Amino acid sequence: MQSSQVKSAMRALEILEYFRRVQQQRSMSEIAADLHYPQSSATVLLKTLINMGYLNFDRRQRVYFPTPKVTALGDWIPRKLFGTGQILDAMRDVHAATGEGVFVGVANDVYLQYIKTLESIHALRFHLDEGTIRPLTQSGAGWLLLSTLSDDKIDNIVRRANIATPNNQRVKLNVMMERIAQIREKGYAVAEDIPILGGRTLCVLLPATVQGQPAALCIGGVAERFRQNHDRYLNALQAAVRSAKIPDSFDIPVNIEI
């Protein structure tokens, strides 16, 4: 595929992500300026998205806004990922008990991906966008997911993740294996100052998988607050995990059509 086609595809998705952030109508000039696109490219992309039914154009005000077709692209995904809803309930339970940012993470090749997040209610907090990825070696959730693999697979992933990581953030295999041994012994992962300086994360494995993959239920926030509340936060995570255990007969959602 030509690089120009790749760039156009990326920009089309960036426009949709842009509307997710601003959540209001925008003119072509505002979109082009905010995303640093040439106006000619923005015009073509917007017209294409209109023709495909993903954007509405108000000719009187000369502004654009997404259509429900954008929502339809992914409205089926949460049910496929989270099944009967126990995972989402577990997230809400932890959020209610701690007020901290909560997320579910899964492996995506050599990366950790945050597939669902709930924002912290504390004044001092860190923001995390759903869909964000980072190398598995660069977060407590990633370490926890690595701990579910054989040592040979961990070796392979660490080497590949290091290739995708800046030199100053690469990890030595023996250091990673020591971390993973501790995680396997304790049954949970804790990380401080990684990936965010001054932040701390606490993670446990969910009993249910997401699309057949192990999933981590985590909370993250200011390190000092986490150190002061470590036991309470860990208890909240473990209680949520116990509540998320799903009987075998309920693993697969049943669709009933009338």
Where are these regions (language model features)?
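A structural signal for short hydrophobic beta-strand segments in well-ordered beta-sheet cores
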Residues: 55-57, 104-105, 206
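Signal-transmission/dimerization alpha-helices at domain junctions
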Residues: 147, 240-251
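Amphipathic alpha-helical regulatory segments at dimerization interfaces
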Residues: 34, 45, 86-97, 103, ...
